[in-house]
Amino acid sequence: MKEKREFRDYLSDIFDAIEKIENFTQDISFDAFVEDEMRVFAVVRALEIIGEAAKNVPLEIKENYPSVPWKEMARTRDKLIHSYFGVDLNVVWKTVNKNLPPLKDQISEILKDLGNTSS
């Protein structure tokens, strides 16, 4: 039987997926990225995981951290899942380089804030 997950698990999933994306895209140009099918697939999958995890974070947590782009994460996941063959890699690359660094900091802060509280 599947173990029940706590909301912190989903926050950790987001953080871990961001770190994986950082590793997948470290020291690589956009041109090299788009030519590397495995890397593209891995990054897109990690973005899907971020969005799916965001959907599972309780509303109370989302309301306590309104500056986190919860809806945007979920929408990105939906766009990737439902239009995979139409994925714009320019948008993916921009998301990776512009949106994920501040998101990583936000999720890290939330995890620190919630570290000593019970779920």
From Swiss-Prot:
Its EC number is 3.1.-.-. Modified by cognate antitoxin MA_102; probably at least 2 successive AMPylation events occur on Tyr-84. GO terms for cellular component: toxin-antitoxin complex. Keywords: Hydrolase, Nuclease, Nucleotide-binding, Phosphoprotein, Toxin-antitoxin system. GO terms for molecular function: nucleotide binding; RNA nuclease activity. The active site is at R77, H82. The modification O-di-AMP-tyrosine is found at Y84. It is an enzyme of class 3 (hydrolase). A motif (RX(4)HXY motif) lies at residues 77-84. The keyword Nuclease applies. Probable toxic component of a putative type VII toxin-antitoxin (TA) system, probably an RNase. Probably neutralized by cognate antitoxin MA_102. Neutralization may be due to AMPylation by MA_102. Belongs to the HepT RNase toxin family. Homodimer, probably forms a complex with cognate antitoxin MA_102. This is Putative RNase MA_0101. The lineage of its organism: Archaea, Methanobacteriati, Methanobacteriota, Stenosarchaea group, Methanomicrobia.
